[in-house]
Swiss-Prot record:
Protein's UniProt keywords contain Metal-binding: yes
Entry-linked NCBIfam families: PRK01117.1 (NF002223), purA (TIGR00184)
Entry annotation: catalytic residues: 13 (proton acceptor), 41 (proton donor)
Pathway field: Purine metabolism; AMP biosynthesis via de novo pathway; AMP from IMP: step 1/2
Species this chain originates from: Lactobacillus johnsonii (strain CNCM I-12250 / La1 / NCC 533)
SUPFAM superfamilies: P-loop containing nucleoside triphosphate hydrolases (SSF52540)
Record bears the keyword Oxidoreductase: no
Cofactor note as given: Binds 1 Mg(2+) ion per subunit.
Annotated coiled-coil segments of the chain: none
Positions contributing to IMP binding: 13-16, 38-41, 128, 142, 223, 238, 302
Record's protein name: Adenylosuccinate synthetase
CDD domains: AdSS
Enzyme Commission number(s) of this protein: 6.3.4.4
Length: 429
């Protein structure tokens, strides 16, 4: 296998960073193709913890470095802050490559995101207010500023003046907010462009050349399938395609180049922000899972909503993202529990269904149909092999795989890179 994609199969925060870091040890390069600094991921290596939002997780181990593709929206201030921190910790960032076609998050995007969300009041979506959505809006309306534009002074000046005229009219007339000044932005972002220049290239060529040479390439998805702009719980979704199809367009390659799509999931389910969540736990069990697993957002610090494992949502993710392998994290959270529940279906208006409804009204009426399994007492954080797992842990994992219809390739029993049980090396045919 030379091309592996790692996608979140729930609502994000599944632990994709850990499995991509683990897989990147064998990869020539690690590639990110969607989202922006709304996608937090945590990597633990030895006694060091790295929390990043934009730089691909694979930068720690991939032999030829990391790639930020054209589908990513880049906040230069955040990106250079992360790069500076990595350099201070002795991480080699010289192999980073940034697409010349990627779009830039501008200061007005962040303000627009904030003003729009505030104006919605109790109908807010739950955006991270990082300017991701407005940046993608400008991309779709063909007014966005790309990385290549920052490298051309005249082009950037013309686009910035045009965009500021439009944004300032919006801010002052609709939201009653002050204008942004051209001089506060122009030189600062030109400088970002010059600082970025040594990393900028046509990443589509770089990645496709690597695949043509049978090099191992790891593609890192951001967020999760259930947050996909088309296939997720719309409108409570992100602004990009988080399924594997979005990886192809977000890097500039054919969809047929992916060999394996690994869906990453937790042993339970979490979600940040608003939106339907059929298996949500609003009791002491949910609180226990949240505190045991430290379920607080990497980017926002917000407490994550917690629920039981939802196989209906996972089957939906499998279908729309082409998931053919499963990586399950945080199995160790259930040590000491009496029982674990898995949603095998929903009940909608008295009828049992096994699909994920598109209608929000229907989703809010769905009640999970649960199957109950016994948990285990043993501490499993030091378990290295499948054989050494408690029998009840094996039964739970086998049932998850059976219900989703996808084989497990890795199981995580702790946050460290080494706390990973490998059932099958995804790089091997």
């Amino acid at each position: 296998m030379t091309a592996i994609a790692v996608v979140g199969s729930q609502w994000g925060d599944e632990g994709k960073g850990k499995i991509t870091d683990f897989l990147s040890k064998e990869a020539a390069m690690a590639v990110r193709s969607n989202g922006g600094n709304n996608a937090g991921h945590t990597i633990e290596i030895g006694d060091k913890t790295f929390k990043m939002r934009l730089i691909p997780s694979g930068i720690f181990a991939a032999k030829k470095g990391a790639v930020i593709g054209n589908g990513v929206v880049i906040n230069p201030e955040v990106m250079f802050g992360e790069l500076d921190n990595l350099e201070k910790e002795g991480i080699d960032i010289s192999g980073l490559k940034i697409s010349n076609r990627a779009h830039i998050i501008m200061p007005y995007h962040i303000l627009q995101d904030t003003y729009q969300e505030e104006a919605k009041g109790d109908k807010k979506i739950g955006t991270t207010k990082n300017g991701i959505g407005p940046c993608y809006m400008d991309k779709a309306s063909r007014t966005g500023i790309r990385v290549c534009d920052l490298l051309e002074r005249d082009t950037f000046e013309e686009k910035l003046r045009t965009n500021l005229a439009e944004k300032n009219a919006l801010f002052t007339k609709v939201y009653g907010k002050p204008e942004l000044k051209f001089e506060d932005i122009f030189e600062k972002y030109l400088e970002y462009g010059q600082k970025m220049k040594k990393y900028v290239t046509d990443t589509s060529v770089v990645v496709n050349d690597a695949l043509d040479n049978d090099e191992k390439v790891l593609f890192e998805g951001a967020q999760g399938v259930m947050l996909d702009i088309d296939e997720g719980t719309y409108p409570y979704v992100t602004s990009s395609n988080t399924i594997s199809g979005g990886i192809a367009s977000g890097i500039g390659m054919g969809a047929n180049r992916l060999d394996t799509v690994i869906g990453v999931c937790k042993a339970y389910t979490t979600r940040v922000g608003e939106g339907p969540f059929p298996t949500e736990l609003l009791d002491e069990v949910g609180d226990r899972i949240r505190e045991t697993a430290h379920e607080y957002g990497t980017v926002t610090g917000r407490p994550r909503r917690v629920g039981w494992f939802d196989s209906v949502a996972l089957r939906h993710a499998k279908r729309v993202a082409g998931i053919n392998a499963l990586s399950l994290n945080l199995l160790d959270v259930f040590s000491g529990f009496d029982k674990i529940k898995i949603a095998t279906a929903y009940e909608l208006d008295g009828e049992k269904i096994d699909y994920y409804p598109a209608s929000l009204k229907e989703l809010y009426r769905c009640k999970p149909v649960y199957e109950e399994l016994p948990a285990w007492e043993e501490d499993i954080t030091n378990v290295k092999t499948w054989e050494d797992l408690p029998e009840n842990a094996k039964k739970f994992l086998n049932r998850v795989s059976e219900l989703v219809g996808v084989p497990l390739v890795t199981v995580s029993v702790g946050p460290d890179r080494e706390q990973t049980i490998v059932l099958k090396n995804p790089w091997e045919k």
